[in-house]
Amino acid sequence: MLKFIGTGSAFNTKLGNTSAYIKENNTLLLIDCGELTFDRILSLNLLDDVNEVHIAVTHTHPDHIGSLGSLIFYCYFIKKIKPIFHAANSDFIELLEIMGITEEHCEFDNCAFDPTVVINSLDLGLYFMENNHVKELMTFGILLVKNPSLEEHEYIIYYSGDSCNIEDNILEAFVSGKINYLYQDTCKADYDGNAHLSLRRLAELIPVELRGKIFIMHTDEGFDFDKAKELGFNIAEIEGGIK
């Protein structure tokens, strides 16, 4: 299961930028790296006992990539680790190059040509799935498949990134049991044209009996956590608590 460095929306800085990770077998997989994330990584000592770093990002809004360059340079110059950046779109790599990051500092894995990533040390497959957030950017959710080489996977997680809905194919796979857990961008704000999914809409989409497999993240200020729990949803928890 995923652990979280932060669970807040762009302006809900009290909860930090939403960023998830898996740390096993001396390997760190980080999903998104917003403005506040690098500092939090250091305070949690997440790079201790790590010799392999994988980074995947869902899109290029600042609360998802704001400290990405600092993390890559720190890994390379201080930890002597060359991280692997799994990019769902070529623009993501171009953005790093504008920051002065080259293939000397970071291995670029351009998933636009092959959307399937296998991290052998974690026995984990990543699959980027285009979703719907804002018209200005290409944005992605990520399927995480444990034991991808086996016919019977240990589990399949869908991580929504930022999204104003749940794509039909993802929802169908979740309801049918093909996806075991869903981490979903959810907000209090509820209006036409919202770039995020409201709690009201989430409750309309997810049957009551399946809500225990949903973890709410990327919450905005004033989000009603008690109501979400009463509706049967889980809340993604920040590792080490709120700072």
Stretch-by-stretch model annotation:
Residues 1-44, 110-169, 240-243:
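Core dinuclear metal-dependent hydrolase active-site scaffold
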Residues 20-21, 46-49, 71-75, 175-177, ...:
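Glycine-rich, phosphate-binding/catalytic loops in enzymes
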Residues 30-34, 51-63, 86-88, 157-163, ...:
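Active-site neighborhood of phospho(di)ester-bond hydrolases with catalytic His/Asp-centered motifs
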Residues 36-84, 178-181:
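Active-site metal-binding motif and surrounding structural segment of the metallo-beta-lactamase
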Residues 50-55, 105-111, 184-185, 234-239:
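Short hydrophobic/aromatic-enriched beta-strand-loop microsegments
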Residues 78-83, 90-112:
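Active-site neighborhood of divalent metal-dependent phosphoester bond hydrolases
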Residues 90-92, 115, 219-223:
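Short, polar loop motifs at secondary-structure junctions
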Residues 164-243:
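Cap/insert and terminal regions of metallo-dependent hydrolase folds
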